[in-house]
Structure formats: C-alpha cells, structure tokens
Amino acid sequence: MRPLILSIFALFLAGCTHSQQSMVDTFRASLFDNQDITVADQQIQALPYSTMYLRLNEGQRIFVVLGYIEQEQSKWLSQDNAMLVTHNGRLLKTVKLNNNLLEVTNSGQDPLRNALAIKDGSRWTRDILWSEDNHFRSATLSSTFSFAGLETLNIAGRNVLCNVWQEEVTSTRPEKQWQNTFWVDSATGQVRQSRQMLGAGVIPVEMTFLKPAP
C-alpha cells in the first residue's frame, strides 16, 4: 500500500500552504516507520477534497483523497493509478492492488443505496469476482441487515450520530459466513464508517469517510 501513501504527496508538494506542508511531513514520518497516518482535524476541514482513512487487510491506515465521481460512483485514486471504487460506503471495485475486487453484480439493489430506508431483515443477493494470491475467485453472496443501535462517532473533530447496521453475509462455494458493519449518518444517510470484506470472507477493508463524497 506504499504507492497509495506516496500518491498523497503529489497533491501537496506543488504550491503547499504551511498547513499542507505540515501534513506532508506527517505522511513522510508515518511512511518510514509504518505508523498509522493521522491528519489533524483542522487540516482535514481545510482541504477542499473528499477524504477518508483506509485500512486494507489489517495493514497500515492511510489517508486517501477522492479523485472523481463517475456515474454516482466515487473513485479514489493513487499516483500509480491504483483505484478504489465505492458507492455510499460500499466497496464495488479495486484496481492495481495486490488483491482486487473485480466485479459486484446487482449493486443497484444494495440497501445502502437508500441507507435511511434500511429495515431489519432487508436482504441483498449478488455475485462477486475477485483476485486473491494471483488466482481468480467468485462467489454468490446473500446478505441480511439488522439494526445494532445508535452510536456517536467523532470524525475529524465533529460528532456524528450514526445508525449502526450489521450485515450478515453468507457465501456459497466457498461456504463462509461473516459480518460487515456500516455506520450511517442518521441525518444524511451517508455511510461514515464501514468494515467489510473485499472477497468472500477474506481481505478486510476498513474505511472512515472524513469528508464524504457529495
């Protein structure tokens, strides 16, 4: 994931303000000792970009900036063209990572598309294709959502009251079960934090949307 971290430098090295240069220094320090990256709340608020913290496969937490939005999908880019594609917190595709999510079908029926309307027992079925250790794998996934209560998250210095939804996921071939969790802003319906799997029960992905995509 080092290329993703390095990609942030390119956004700030040209024409840095004092605050932005301080942020680059933070990235450099974290990069070389493998610490989780933490950006000061005021620096996050000052940036004109949508941003998130990302942790892949229990590795180092990094700071990612939104590249662009296309067909309602948020595309988070690195300097070497690695990319993550999300829609309201749901990971839909990755490109040029060590292991990649290649396809998710039936994404239009994902209950997270209208997160404030999710109810206990909401269901979703889709097929996924991913690469893992240089092998292509596929599975059919079936999900059931359950409400886990309210929780207030402190995100970039602001308290956000969230509906917490647990997504119980079952896959066939391979036969696996696991749980994804989504924290949905109770006012806007935007997913502000998530824990989910890239593949069928493998490769955990954690995202905290500091300034969510519009």
UniProtKB/Swiss-Prot annotation:
Location of the protein in the cell: Cell membrane
Q: How does it sit in the membrane?
A: Lipid-anchor
What keywords is this UniProt entry annotated with? Answer: Cell membrane, Lipoprotein, Membrane, Palmitate, Signal
Gene Ontology, cellular component aspect: plasma membrane
Which residues, per the entry, are lipid-modified as S-diacylglycerol cysteine? Answer: 16
Keyword Kinase present in the record's keywords: the answer is no
Q: Which residues carry the N-palmitoyl cysteine lipidation?
A: 16
Q: InterPro entries given for it?
A: GfcB, YmcC_sf
**Signal peptide residue numbers:** 1-15
Keyword field contains tRNA processing:
no
What the record says about family reads:
To E.coli YjbF.
- Protein name per the record: Uncharacterized lipoprotein GfcB
Q: Which organism is it from?
A: Escherichia coli (strain K12)
